[in-house]
Design a protein with these regions (language model features):
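Cap/insert and terminal regions of metallo-dependent hydrolase folds
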Residues: 94-97, 164-263
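Active-site metal-binding loops of divalent metal-dependent hydrolases
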Residues: 36-38, 70, 129-130, 161-163, ...
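Catalytic core of the metallo-beta-lactamase
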Residues: 18-27, 117-183, 206, 210
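Structural motif
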Residues: 30-32, 63-64, 88, 122, ...
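Divalent metal-coordination and catalytic microenvironments
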Residues: 25, 35, 69, 76, ...
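Pre-active-site segment of Zn-dependent metallo-hydrolases
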Residues: 2, 6, 28-70, 77-82, ...
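Conserved beta-strand hairpin/beta-sheet module of binuclear metal-dependent hydrolase folds
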Residues: 8-54, 64, 141-161
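Metallo-beta-lactamase
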Residues: 2-10, 92-155, 244-273
Length: 275
């Protein structure tokens, strides 16, 4: 981990796509890493097709880790083992309790409706996603999945984790930002693809078109898709989801506000993006 790297200050929001659901978020002088996964494959057969956009040893000093749920593509024990244990690790209560029992004593539960302040000015609010996040078939008590809204007095970012599109998916943004008559700066949304013979996919995930619909509902200034281009899938390639999203964007009226970045690339939104 690299100390002394400059931090995003002022009203800038910087997002670096590490891969899959691992994003490095820098805002309000704070650095947060989401769902860290730096493994070369998922399970035995689903190989990683792109190296992490930032090597785990090259990460800057972090202020917090955010875990959304216990699925293996979002909760990587091998990755957690390589990160310092003095970084606060926030997760759904049942997941955090499990992590503590496994020796990750820096894990802290954060539940739907709760929030924590990181640094001097960044507030992280939690909402419940529509996604069964238990790791195994027998641990349904561990199925809760978090989504997170990060906001200071100047900027905001919504990290959806894994979720389906439902009439209430926007509830966290509504409760925190809309109640203050504020607009969301950027929606960080997962995209996926499953063939027609797998209809259950959309009960817990967003397709690219679902993500565009949610982006419209959230009334955010910008959108960044993730959850693509990292691991092979059983029913699709690693790039099917982003290829379909790009096709949908060709004639979409929001295409100039959707930012597709490759692993290792960063997007910075300054104050001018909020005018």
């Amino acid at each position: 981990m690299v100390d002394g790297a400059p931090r995003a200050q002022g009203e800038a929001v910087k997002i670096t796509y590490v891969g899959h659901a691992t994003l490095l978020l820098e805002m309000a002088g704070v650095r947060i890493l989401t769902d860290p996964n730096f493994e070369p494959k998922l399970g035995r057969f689903l190989a990683r097709v792109a190296a992490p956009g930032v090597a785990i040893d090259a990460l800057p000093a972090l202020d917090a880790l955010l875990l959304t749920h216990a699925h293996a593509d979002h909760l990587s024990f091998k990755s957690l083992d390589r990160l310092p244990r003095n970084i606060p690790l926030y997760a759904p209560p049942a997941v955090a309790q499990w992590l503590v029992r496994k020796g990750y004593r820096h894990a802290t539960p954060i539940d739907d409706g709760e929030h924590v302040t990181i640094g001097q000015a960044l507030r992280v609010h939690t909402g419940r996603a529509t996604h069964k996040g238990n790791r195994y078939g027998f641990d349904r008590w561990r199925s809760a999945t978090n989504m997170y809204l990060l906001e200071s007095n100047e900027e905001s970012a919504f990290f959806a984790g894994d979720t389906a599109l439902t009439p209430s998916t926007h509830h966290l943004v509504e409760r925190v930002l809309w109640a203050q008559q504020r607009q969301l700066d950027i929606a960080l949304l997962p995209i996926g693809y499953a063939p027609a013979w797998k209809p259950g996919f959309r009960r817990g995930h967003l397709t690219g078109d679902d993500a565009l619909a949610l982006f419209k509902t959230l009334r955010a200034r910008a959108m960044l898709p993730y959850h693509w281009g990292t691991f092979r899938h059983v029913t699709a390639s690693a790039h099917d989801a982003i290829d379909r999203l790009r096709a949908s964007l060709v004639l979409h009226d929001a295409r100039e506000h959707v930012h597709v970045i490759e692993p290792g690339e960063s997007l910075t939104l300054g104050p001018e993006a909020r005018r």
